[in-house]
From Swiss-Prot:
<dbReference type="InterPro" id="IPR009619">
    <property type="entry name" value="CrgA"/>
</dbReference>
<dbReference type="Pfam" id="PF06781">
    <property type="entry name" value="CrgA"/>
</dbReference>
<keyword id="KW-1133">Transmembrane helix</keyword>
<dbReference type="GO" id="GO:0051301">
    <property type="term" value="P:cell division"/>
</dbReference>
<comment type="function">
    <text>Involved in cell division.</text>
</comment>
<feature type="region of interest" description="Disordered">
    <location>
        <begin position="1"/>
        <end position="26"/>
    </location>
</feature>
<keyword id="KW-0132">Cell division</keyword>
<keyword id="KW-0472">Membrane</keyword>
<feature type="compositionally biased region" description="Polar residues">
    <location>
        <begin position="7"/>
        <end position="26"/>
    </location>
</feature>
<protein>
    <recommendedName>
        <fullName>Cell division protein CrgA</fullName>
    </recommendedName>
</protein>
<comment type="similarity">
    <text>Belongs to the CrgA family.</text>
</comment>
<keyword id="KW-0812">Transmembrane</keyword>
<dbReference type="GO" id="GO:0005886">
    <property type="term" value="C:plasma membrane"/>
</dbReference>
<keyword id="KW-0131">Cell cycle</keyword>
<feature type="transmembrane region" description="Helical">
    <location>
        <begin position="38"/>
        <end position="58"/>
    </location>
</feature>
<feature type="transmembrane region" description="Helical">
    <location>
        <begin position="69"/>
        <end position="89"/>
    </location>
</feature>
<keyword id="KW-1003">Cell membrane</keyword>
């Protein structure tokens, strides 16, 4: 009668409780400081408010009227800075 092939899985001892072999690891994570979160959300909020103000009252505000299409760059730039900061948020 032919014999079955021996595989690595059949040789290795199988533990009934796989977590018994593991040692607990402490995660030393303090999280993101409060000032980082405040600045991140402030960038996003100011960018959004800049775009809304440009849309609603842009022609009536002299310096926003002079910036013309740069208002979109400023507004979206502030939003993008806030969104890029979310990658550092833990």
């Amino acid at each position: 009668m032919p014999k079955a092939k021996v595989t690595k899985n059949s040789i290795a001892p199988v533990s009934s409780n796989p977590s018994a072999n593991r040692t607990p690891v402490k995660i030393n994570s303090t999280g993101t400081p409060m000032w980082y979160k405040v600045i991140m959300f402030a960038f996003m909020l100011v960018g959004l408010l800049w775009l809304v103000a440009n849309y609603l009252v842009g022609p009536q505000i002299p310096f926003m009227n002079e910036l013309d299409a740069w208002n979109y760059g400023i507004g979206f730039g502030l939003l993008i800075i806030g969104l890029l900061m979310t990658m550092g948020w833990r």
